[in-house]
Amino acid sequence: MLPSTIQTLTLFLTSGGVLLSLYVSASLSYLLYSDILLKFSPKITAPTMTLDCTNASNVQAVNRSATKEMTFLLPEPEWTYPRLSCQGSTFQKALLISPHRFGEARGNSAPLIIREPFIACGPKECKHFALTHYAAQPGGYYNGTREDRNKLRHLISVKLGKIPTVENSIFHMAAWSGSACHDGREWTYIGVDGPDSNALIKIKYGEAYTDTYHSYANNILRTQESACNCIGGDCYLMITDGSASGISKCRFLKIREGRIIKEIFPTGRVEHTEECTCGFASNKTIECACRDNNYTAKRPFVKLNVETDTAEIRLMCTETYLDTPRPDDGSITGPCESNGDKGRGGIKGGFVHQRMASKIGRWYSRTMSKTERMGMELYVKYDGDPWTDSDALDPSGVMVSIKEPGWYSFGFEIKDKKCDVPCIGIEMVHDGGKKTWHSAATAIYCLMGSGQLLWDTVTGVDMAL
């Protein structure tokens, strides 16, 4: 279907000369597309005109002005596909969004109290998403802001680089779990809320609420807390439903223009998979590094074939264990599928691909502390298979020191003109406990240049102020 973006070029021809008038209606954002359809419709008008003549009594003058209208219909933008990554061999500190450095502001300029931030990008812009408690700091509604789920939480966004304040934020839907992605034409927003025993996934495409998906295990249906992934108009979303301390089997929803068109049921090691961070390894395969909150400190690793719409899960085999809490690296014996110990509890992990012509890099993040959500390091592994490679990952630098909070982390890609820039974001939580506000900053590191990762990030926030 063609969009409403129309350009009308009207050429008025008169005996006194040529008047060219260009009318542009709606948006010019799609001018980069070259296919143009032309439609001509003739119009005839007869304006009055005075003529000078020496013998005017014997002359009757008639003027005709002919109008030709040309209507330019611009086609819709293209669906997005993964491209090769932009050049680079290291990540560097790109951006810090620390809203509560502005905590003295009040009213519409006050920063929202948020958690679970993530970033998703379309062809023209990136959005910084989060789940708010419908409260700001300073304010009088701090009670309950440490809760994961309640009736006040909403999925919000700002343009990346903006501070998520009351006036800057767009409230998309009521939600205590969320995701979002851009298919090249429009945004898809995902929100989950409702009672633990009967939660509901809601889908919004652009400004329209388009579809829902009901709980299948009646135990906190939830989604990934990071961007879903789109290719050729199809967007893939990871969901799970089940006990945080037991079985929680994930599924993938295939969504097109805001409507669910298929459910995908992974095979393999499916006991517990949640909070997946996913991205494209190629035009054929989505890969996800996920969280097992009950059985192991290894990350469940998903491979989803978008040509066959099939998915399989196995544990990562590397001796660098990526969850928190975790045992000492290399201490788990036995085959790759061995769970090991210290598997209770967990944290969402950052993961992003570096797609190159001759090889692929997989970048991961994990906390510096083995037991606490403190600090964040970056790791990389080129080529190989995460299911079978037992070698250690290569450390690539400290993004957050062990003295600073490092909670959830996630991956995303910024779209340059001809390539994609892989990035990792880190949630740095201000944990005020149950007696005061509980919110987060976001640190962002992206692939750029060469050398070594140079500097870590601090929030600069003192909750006692």
Swiss-Prot record:
Subcellular location: Virion membrane; Host apical cell membrane
Pfam families xref list: Neur
Enzyme Commission code(s) on record: 3.2.1.18
Keyword set includes Iron: no
Regulation: Inhibited by the neuraminidase inhibitors zanamivir (Relenza) and oseltamivir (Tamiflu). These drugs interfere with the release of progeny virus from infected cells and are effective against all influenza strains. Resistance to neuraminidase inhibitors is quite rare.
Segments in the Virion surface topological domain: 35-465
This protein's UniProt keywords: Calcium, Disulfide bond, Glycoprotein, Glycosidase, Host cell membrane, Host membrane, Hydrolase, Membrane, Metal-binding, Signal-anchor, Transmembrane, Transmembrane helix, Virion
Glycosylation sites: N55, N63, N143, N283, N294
GO molecular-function terms, A-Z: exo-alpha-sialidase activity; metal ion binding
UniProt: substrate binding residues: R115, R149, E274, E275, R291, R373
Active site: D148, Y408
Spans annotated as Involved in apical transport and lipid raft association: 13-35
Membrane topology note: Single-pass type II membrane protein
Cofactor(s) the protein needs: Ca(2+)
Modification note: N-glycosylated.
Intravirion topological intervals: 1-11
The reaction(s) this protein catalyses: Hydrolysis of alpha-(2->3)-, alpha-(2->6)-, alpha-(2->8)- glycosidic linkages of terminal sialic acid residues in oligosaccharides, glycoproteins, glycolipids, colominic acid and synthetic substrates
Subunit and interaction comment: Homotetramer.
HAMAP family hit by this protein: INFV_NRAM
The family this protein is said to belong to: Belongs to the glycosyl hydrolase 34 family.
Domain comment in the entry: Intact N-terminus is essential for virion morphogenesis. Possesses two apical sorting signals, one in the ectodomain, which is likely to be a glycan, and the other in the transmembrane domain. The transmembrane domain also plays a role in lipid raft association.
UniProt protein name: Neuraminidase
Gene that this sequence comes from: NA
